[in-house]
């Protein structure tokens, strides 16, 4: 567990981050199933769906966890989402042609999109909680 500099309180709440991760994965799976049945069309729309899922997951993690660690909880949700997505992709096609769809630019863009969504969601939750605490 990470400790804060001043008060010694927890910054990362793993339960909150886990809830946010589950929410983000469920939103992505349900959204892609309902909106994109052929999996390879409308890449921009799929990116927006993933970004929205991470915003929601990061926001939930920021609301449930400690107020000082809202942003960190959002980041943990995003990193966990990347790990889950890569593990799911690893289960996919295997063999010499199985990884032909991997490109470095696409991977970087996906990861930046995911990390931005989780971080912004956590930041937004922290701002909301600080305003309501006043």
Residue ranges of model-derived segments:
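Juxtamembrane/disordered regions of integral membrane proteins
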Residues: 1-134
